[in-house]
Amino acid sequence: MSLKGTKTEINILTAFAGESQARNRYAYFASRARKEGYVQIADVFEETANQEKEHAGRLFKLLEGGDVQVQALFPAGTIGTTADNLKAAADGENHEWTDMYPSFAAVARQEGLENIALIFEAIAVAEKQHEKRYRSMMSNILSGKVFRKDDVVAWRCRNCGYVHEGKEAPKLCPACAHPQAYFEILAENW
């Protein structure tokens, strides 16, 4: 079945535009996070930007060409503090997985496009995880827990791999002299 002239075609292009814009916003947010001393958060923004690029690419490949007129609202916000940017990103991801993609999937099903409905639903799963990660990182900033924890944990220097055990990441890595900004909780998930 052709997408031309369907609501699903408009929804795909709307989602493509939204994912593309999110990618750029997250790249800008990464730069701010890095400047504020949050290297791990900057890397998460960059990783998520690349994931949004993949979503946009999947959607773009579904389109059949030609011009499609869309009317949509997109965030035209500013680049705030890293905590502000995490909140804005989490709110956007929440909208995508709780409202936008489910409604787009419902329309696709009504139009007999089950395969596209499933794609919308799969992307929504990723957006839910993006929101969860952003909200957790925002909470860490607001509670002063990015580089300090209540219990002893293993901290890993993202630059050289040095591991320190303690409630707080070192102010300076004793192995490579990189600042605290480069430390994260050691995650062994292999």
Please place each PLM-identified region on the residue numbering.
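Non-heme di-metal
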Residues: 1-190
